[in-house]
């Protein structure tokens, strides 16, 4: 039978059907190969938007730099990055006037945080450009390598573990004549295998010392490595994103801390809050505009889109903003905060892996690394790539491109939001001094603008004025991609507003299903996602019940744990049937052991083990929750774990779920093939790091774990803690005198060894 799909929507209000048009089912597109082309696009575009600026040469690195600040005022609607310093400063001043004390208070909050933040803050985050190895590494490893190199070059401020001291080292490192680093390299040689008598290739990992002169070191310190952004839906072309090195990260973190503190106090800011809190904040602004537009006034809303937000932003503008925001603060604080924008004004973009060439006969493949693009003959490239390379050549130094204007994705989300809000703030009647006025919402590069005026001409005039004001600070509202509607219907950060926010359920689709962590976590995450969507996203009871059934089905297929009385044959069915037959109370078996599903939408908040505990056979309970079970490598499990779920837009978000430790909470072991590669040295460093952290956690269990404030090292802290604990245990009779003496002796030995080192 043919079904006319439009019939499905007859009873559905149009706004609720919006989510069916979203590209969120199925796998998102991933990029393959090199991101070099996308990075060159970004660099070339950024320079094009600022082309009428002034060219200068960086005296330290020799990099050509383009400065568009205070450039010509725009004469057309093309996007441009010519922000006017005085306009930005004035916008800041008006923002402060409407929010008395906002900058002052945020500075005080930030100053406190700056003095307390530990350097381990930088271990958060995933891939980071590791300047010592000139490629990406996990953040913790990149930080450890950086500190190790600093230490071997005589920089020791970071011993105490405060981030601010590490940043002092960074600043000092930039004045050094040269830096000595250790790099990993790989040797291959052919040897005869004793067992099989065949020739095999043996790889050995070498570490070699290398000296970087001041220029080379500065280039590396200012480098952002680039990658292709993966899993972006609804786009035909991929784009490049940047990952900064350890020298830049700490400074950016403090600037963003200050900006976050300001954003929290601004009602128009969509950051840093999220979810329902964000919806409530936005609904307030809309309500204000609706109630104030009396019967005589019209109110319209623009669902806004900005052209190339971060390619038109400029670090020099951010420097001006920070200089203004911190103007009455102590000198040291102003200096710390101004370093990030200064580094960004001198940044270099690493072009990535370069290009791969294949010969026509397909026998030969060769990699052209980015370093060669400056000198290689262009006849090998196709037309579009040739144009890109020609354009970028004047900017190249050692395989990196000088990129002074523009901000690369996701670096200063909070601070750029402050800039956007400062323009929205100018829409108050006391500033527009006419009959029209505006307000709105800003979240990084996304905005919604609400304009009120007595008539249509007034609305048009208000929009024009907003558009031109934005141009003055380097924000380019796209006239093609923004659209205007009567207030009451708009979209902002993928929230659809129609007299209240409509649940855009399709956003959550990717997070339904089996996560693939382990049987225990997956069950818990699956039901939590359904529960959360019933709370937050209008997932109705009938649909939730269906989602639950589909999830259980999916789960059983993933782990091949169909019910013990099923006809389905899998590798596991023999064992599961045997278990089913031996079990008296079959309802007590977990789904992952072939048991029935007891979940319904009323009990989703209860972990499965708790739900079935009373129904379990005693010997099954004993096997399931046995910490001595040799088949399980047990983590000490907190009562709540965090899972990473992938909503459709924005970064992966962390979601809490209840974790009950059972023999199903296994942790997969690391793939051994890594041990034969050049990554091996890095892996060993990482394990060492892990061991130290675990040891530290043992001494300071989470109940008593406060961030150490003071200047003792981890070892000193652990030794003094051991002494205190030993004394308490000895005095309360928990340990004998000999044991107490032995602990004290070990502590003294450790201290002695440290002194000798």
Curated annotation (Swiss-Prot):
Annotated segments matching region Disordered: 50-82
Listed EC numbers: 2.7.7.48
Reactions catalysed, as given in the entry: RNA(n) + a ribonucleoside 5'-triphosphate = RNA(n+1) + diphosphate
Subcellular localization, as worded in the UniProt entry: Host nucleus; Host cytoplasm
Polar residues bias: start-end ranges: 55-64
RdRp catalytic domain boundaries: 286-483
This protein's UniProt keywords: Eukaryotic host gene expression shutoff by virus, Eukaryotic host transcription shutoff by virus, Host cytoplasm, Host gene expression shutoff by virus, Host nucleus, Host-virus interaction, Inhibition of host RNA polymerase II by virus, Nucleotide-binding, Nucleotidyltransferase, Phosphoprotein, RNA-directed RNA polymerase, Transferase, Viral RNA replication, Viral transcription
Primary localization class, coarse: host cell
One GO MF term attached to the UniProt entry: RNA-directed RNA polymerase activity
Database matches in Gene3D superfamilies: 6.10.140.720
A Gene Ontology cellular-component term: host cell cytoplasm
Region (Promoter-binding site): 249-256
Entry-linked InterPro entries: RNA-dir_pol_NSvirus, RNA_pol_PB1_influenza
Residue window of motif Nuclear localization signal: 187-195, 203-216
PROSITE patterns: RDRP_SSRNA_NEG_SEG
UniProt keyword Nucleotidyltransferase present: yes
Region forming the signal peptide: none
Gene Ontology BP term (one): symbiont-mediated suppression of host gene expression
PTMs per UniProt: Phosphorylated by host PRKCA.
Keyword DNA damage: no
Subunit structure: Influenza RNA polymerase is composed of three subunits: PB1, PB2 and PA. Interacts (via N-terminus) with PA (via C-terminus). Interacts (via C-terminus) with PB2 (via N-terminus); this interaction is essential for transcription initiation.
Family statement: Belongs to the influenza viruses polymerase PB1 family.
Name this protein carries in UniProt: RNA-directed RNA polymerase catalytic subunit
């Amino acid at each position: 039978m043919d079904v006319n799909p439009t019939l499905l929507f007859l009873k559905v209000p149009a706004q609720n059907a919006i989510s069916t048009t979203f590209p969120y089912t199925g796998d998102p597109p991933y990029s393959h190969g090199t991101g070099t082309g996308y990075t060159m696009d970004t660099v070339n575009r950024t320079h094009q938007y600022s082309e009428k600026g002034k060219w200068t040469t960086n005296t330290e690195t020799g990099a050509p730099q383009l400065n568009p600040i205070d450039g010509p005022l725009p004469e057309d609607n093309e996007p441009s990055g010519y922000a006017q310093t005085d306009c930005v400063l004035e916008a800041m001043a008006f923002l402060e006037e409407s929010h008395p004390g906002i900058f002052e208070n945020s500075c005080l909050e930030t100053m406190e945080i700056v003095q307390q933040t530990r350097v381990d803050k930088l271990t958060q985050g995933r891939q980071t450009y590791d300047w010592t190895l000139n490629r990406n590494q996990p953040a913790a490893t990149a930080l450890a390598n950086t500190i190790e190199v600093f230490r071997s070059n005589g920089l020791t401020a970071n011993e105490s573990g405060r981030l601010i001291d590490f940043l002092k080292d960074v600043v000092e490192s930039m004045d050094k004549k040269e830096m000595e680093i250790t790099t990993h390299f790989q040797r291959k040689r052919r040897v005869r295998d004793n067992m099989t008598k065949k020739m095999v290739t043996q790889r050995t990992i070498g570490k070699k010392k290398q000296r970087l002169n001041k220029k080379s070191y500065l280039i590396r310190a200012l480098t952002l490595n680039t990658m292709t952004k993966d899993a972006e839906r609804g786009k035909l072309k991929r784009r490049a994103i940047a990952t900064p090195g350890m020298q830049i990260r700490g400074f950016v973190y403090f600037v963003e801390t200050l900006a976050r503190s300001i954003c929290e106090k601004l009602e128009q800011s969509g950051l840093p809050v999220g979810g329902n809190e964000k919806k409530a904040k936005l609904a307030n602004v809309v309500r204000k505009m609706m109630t104030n537009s009396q019967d005589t006034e019209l109110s319209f809303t623009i669902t806004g889109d900005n052209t190339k937000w971060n390619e038109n932003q400029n670090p020099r503008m951010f420097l001006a903003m920070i200089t203004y925001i911190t103007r009455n603060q102590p000198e040291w604080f102003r200096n710390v905060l101004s370093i990030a924008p200064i580094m960004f004004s001198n940044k270099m973009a690493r072009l990535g892996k370069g290009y791969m060439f294949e010969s026509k006969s397909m026998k030969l493949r060769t990699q052209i690394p980015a370093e060669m693009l400056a000198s290689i003959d262009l006849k090998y490239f196709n037309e579009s790539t040739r144009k890109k390379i020609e354009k970028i050549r004047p900017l190249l130094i050692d395989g990196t491109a000088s990129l002074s204007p523009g901000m690369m994705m996701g670096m200063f989300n909070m601070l750029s939001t402050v800039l956007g809000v400062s323009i929205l703030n100018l829409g108050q009647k006391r500033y527009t001094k006419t009959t029209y006025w505006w307000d709105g919402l800003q979240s990084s590069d996304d905005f919604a603008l609400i304009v009120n005026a007595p008539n249509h001409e007034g609305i048009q005039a208000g929009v024009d004025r907003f558009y031109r004001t934005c141009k003055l600070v380097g924000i380019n509202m796209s006239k093609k991609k923004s659209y205007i509607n009567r207030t009451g219907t708009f979209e902002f950060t993928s929230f659809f507003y129609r007299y209240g926010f409509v649940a855009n359920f399709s956003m959550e689709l990717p997070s339904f299903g089996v996560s693939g962590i382990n049987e225990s976590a997956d069950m818990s995450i699956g039901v939590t996602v359904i529960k959360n969507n019933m709370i937050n996203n209008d997932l109705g009871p009938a649909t939730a019940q269906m989602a639950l059934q589909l999830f259980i089905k999916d789960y059983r297929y993933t782990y091949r744990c169909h019910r013990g009385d099923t006809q389905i044959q899998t590798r596991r069915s023999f064992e599961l049937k045997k278990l089913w037959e031996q079990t008296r109370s079959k309802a007590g078996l977990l789904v992952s052991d072939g048991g029935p599903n007891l979940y319904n939408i009323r009990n989703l908040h209860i972990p499965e083990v708790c739900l079935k505990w009373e129904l379990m056979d005693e010997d099954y309970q004993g096997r399931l929750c046995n910490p001595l079970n040799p088949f399980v490598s047990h983590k000490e499990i907190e009562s709540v774990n965090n899972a990473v779920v992938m909503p459709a837009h924005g970064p992966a978000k962390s979601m809490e779920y209840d974790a009950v430790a059972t023999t199903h909470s296994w942790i997969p072991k690391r793939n051994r093939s890594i041990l034969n590669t050049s990554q091996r040295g890095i892996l060993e460093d990482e394990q060492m790091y892990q061991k130290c952290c675990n040891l530290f956690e043992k001494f300071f269990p989470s109940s008593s774990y406060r961030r150490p404030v003071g200047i003792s090292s981890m070892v000193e802290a652990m030794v003094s803690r051991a002494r205190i604990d030993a004394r308490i245990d000895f005095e309360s009779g928990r340990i004998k005198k000999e044991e107490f003496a032995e602990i004290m002796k070990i502590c003294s030995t450790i201290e002695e060894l440290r002194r000798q080192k």
